[in-house]
Amino acid sequence: MEKAERRVNGPMAGQALEKLQSFFNRGTKLVTHHLHSLFFYKGFIYVVIGFLLGRAFILSEVLPFALPFFGAMLLIRRDKAFYAVLAVLAGALTISPKHSLLILAALLAFFVFSKVAAFITDDRVKALPIVVFFSMAAARAGFVYAQNGVFTTYDYVMAIVEAGLSFILTLIFLQSLPIFTVKKVKQSLKIEEIICFMILIASVLTGLAGLSYQGMQAEHILARYVVLSFSFIGGASIGCTVGVVTGLILGLANIGNLYQMSLLAFSGLLGGLLKEGKKAGAAIGLIVGSLLISLYGEGSAGLMTTLYESLIAVCLFLLTPQSITRKVARYIPGTVEHLQEQQQYARKIRDVTAQKVDQFSNVFHALSESFATFYQASDEQTDDSEVDLFLSKITEHSCQTCYKKNRCWVQNFDKTYDLMKQVMLETEEKEYASNRRLKKEFQQYCSKSKQVEELIEDELAHHHAHLTLKKKVQDSRRLVAEQLLGVSEVMADFSREIKREREQHFLQEEQIIEALQHFGIEIQHVEIYSLEQGNIDIEMTIPFSGHGESEKIIAPMLSDILEEQILVKAEQHSPHPNGYSHVAFGSTKSYRVSTGAAHAAKGGGLVSGDSYSMMELGARKYAAAISDGMGNGARAHFESNETIKLLEKILESGIDEKIAIKTINSILSLRTTDEIYSTLDLSIIDLQDASCKFLKVGSTPSFIKRGDQVMKVQASNLPIGIINEFDVEVVSEQLKAGDLLIMMSDGIFEGPKHVENHDLWMKRKMKGLKTNDPQEIADLLMEEVIRTRSGQIEDDMTVVVVRIDHNTPKWASIPVPAIFQNKQEIS
């Protein structure tokens, strides 16, 4: 029976505990929500700040806080300014009625000077500090004169000091008060903005002067709590800065508290240095720092008071929810939370951008399909529809007025249609005149045969023109469809690149972190996006030191771990001291190229019909191209140069090279009716594996020189611009380090005089070359060809030479101990 009761009571007790915990959580959230609404949405926070700033003063009699706060409130939260001024006056009354009267006088002067400033300028933000300055100076001068009846030099100086401080505090409050507004704070705060915010906090703490319990000052406790919180959030630099600023303001309020600047600064420094020990470490730093400075400042007399004040501040710090410290840390530069916030923001921007690019890609793809469908539908139209249209035009001018119309087209429709169709086809093929049987049959059948024959001949000319125009339009649609599809694919690839997410390589990340930390390098974070051979992509977050560890140490170590040359692709240094750098590592190119070119116009002129280009395509491809325009001179130069420019733009956009050449061909063939064309010789080298694609359109052969061997590369394609549609033949070759790729126009290849076999002559000259320098080879080949012509340049000449070599990195790989290296798993 007891067991049964325990079994029943156990679950019931658990359910009751869960209900109690749920009720407590709901209550906590409700209270937090109401407090947040009360302080920030309803503006009670400004009442609290105004009350404490009304109590705040420095140098025993200077009141520079109240009027700047009210002026800033008028600009930032005008709807809460009335409550703020009441709070300021109430706070001043708790000190003395004299303070309250001075602030009231300053407010009245402020309204007067504001009206004057409104007539001078419309920029209220720029005018506010000046208005506050004159208002505070006038109020102090009038108050002192009314009180004493005289105005001494000391009073002048104090009035100017008070007005100057009010001027500066107005600028500071304009920067710091917006942090308390309901609107979302920007992603990060500058160091200057943090200092302005701390001056505001310290000014508010000054208003707590005089509140004490058994010798423990309220402003001391809260000041240490603020310094401890910021040292834990932002580290030693932020903690020390906050300590100096807070201590300085408290010291100005009470000369006896001047040592607090040293105490708070040193405590903030120690707390920040010990932040790695979590809250306990930062708390120990505060206690040790405050005790040490207290021993030097006050001796053993106030040691226990200082200890109690620090312990209370530590208790408040330990009771502060971690969610609050994390939320504040998001706005402090250099913190991990700020870095994560930045990454999250960048990820959101990336997703939005990728979504937009995807939408554009889908639009272009839909347009491409629409054009392609229309183009295919046009191609699938049967010849019968064309024949029907043609015959309808013939009958309209002949059979409509014929007396045999009913017999031919009603009673014998099929026979009439077939006979006229046969006559049309025979006439189109130029065989009707010789086909006596068909001609006789048609003349016997049709009473207007002569008229119909003439109409068919005339209409055929118009019909052919119509078909030619229709073909042009169809080719244009096909070109647009292919281009839109190419653009869609490029944008889809770009979207995938934007949306690139890190792959799950937890084991490899741990191995890399352990290896680097064993070497003495601190790594904050590692993200591996890809370990694909030749496409490695790793990003790291490391402390910024400015000594180039990324390039000199980390990249060489990764090269040994991954068995592939790694280099720094991008590095973003932290603009703040003790911040973090974001470094991207990637595969380096396995090969590099060096180039040379020689170029000459016919007859030594300035304008050549040849054009050439050498360019990098992305990170791992290199392209060289030569175009030879038909003939010589300006027109040929225009054609070849236009071909090269179009090729560069299209290839750089990422569109496939075959589509690029087809597009250029369609553009050049459609844009004019002149019989012009240009050749194109294109080579694309993959710098990762040294493979090479040759796309030759009406061009001369290319040559690969490998040691003493010379290999010819050629393909048979018509020149660009002759026909509207053709298939590009692609020739692939595998290059090796040390190979020389030699491309040339027909002016070089066919230039040698009295040479029957140009291939053998060119190979013999290449084998005889004693240099491997690309520029020297280009110059020597051109010189040899010109020499065979007795120094005459009888055609445009262009030769391009590309040498491929292994890419040797700047820094050699650093061996990693085998205990940290599991290359099978890494790769």
Curated annotation (Swiss-Prot):
Protein name: Stage II sporulation protein E
Domain PPM-type phosphatase: 594-804
SMART domains for the chain: PP2C_SIG, PP2Cc
Organism: Bacillus subtilis (strain 168)
Alphabetized SUPFAM superfamilies for the sequence: PP2C-like
A GO molecular-function annotation: phosphatase activity
Location of the protein in the cell: Cell membrane
Entry membrane topology: Multi-pass membrane protein
Cited function: Normally needed for pro-sigma E processing during sporulation but can be bypassed in vegetative cells. Activates SpoIIAA by dephosphorylation.
Ranges of the Cytoplasmic topological domain: 341-827
An example Gene Ontology biological process: sporulation resulting in formation of a cellular spore
Membrane spanning stretches: 49-69, 71-91, 116-136, 142-162, 175-195, 206-226, 247-267, 269-289, 299-319, 320-340
InterPro entries linked to this entry: Bact_Sigma-Reg, PPM-type-like_dom_sf, PPM-type_phosphatase-like_dom, SpoII_E, SpoIIE_N
Cofactor: Mn(2+)
The protein's Enzyme Commission number: 3.1.3.16
Keyword entries, A-Z: Cell membrane, Hydrolase, Membrane, Protein phosphatase, Sporulation, Transmembrane, Transmembrane helix
Enzyme class (EC, first level): hydrolase
Reaction(s) catalysed (UniProt annotation): O-phospho-L-seryl-[protein] + H2O = L-seryl-[protein] + phosphate; O-phospho-L-threonyl-[protein] + H2O = L-threonyl-[protein] + phosphate
GO cellular component, one term: plasma membrane
NCBIfam families: spore_II_E
